[in-house]
């Protein structure tokens, strides 16, 4: 395996993925994941070379994240802003197919600024469950279940 050359995880100063909250995924010879500032990145799994970066999937903020779950030829993505996204990851970039607000974020990220104060960014860091064509998701106030089947809409 390869090791990145950067010693910082700040955006623009990293050459790989500094995955702090969620696990990156491997598809063939490629790695896709969210770094510690919300940047979705695609890497060559053989060399570690960064192929692309997208700021579109979730907020570009400290500890921003998204949970990636494979479903056939695409992925269900739940970002920390409460959106359910259907997407594909390719060697050339991120392809978003659809997005809908599934649940409201209700928890503070507790992120500290460089000056030591708490940044009040409201997030949802709960990984959903999938079963029998449904998604079950929660925040600090509710648990919801929604159908993922097209025939239900």
Segment roles from a protein language model:
Residues 1-153:
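Noncatalytic, solvent-exposed loop/strand surfaces
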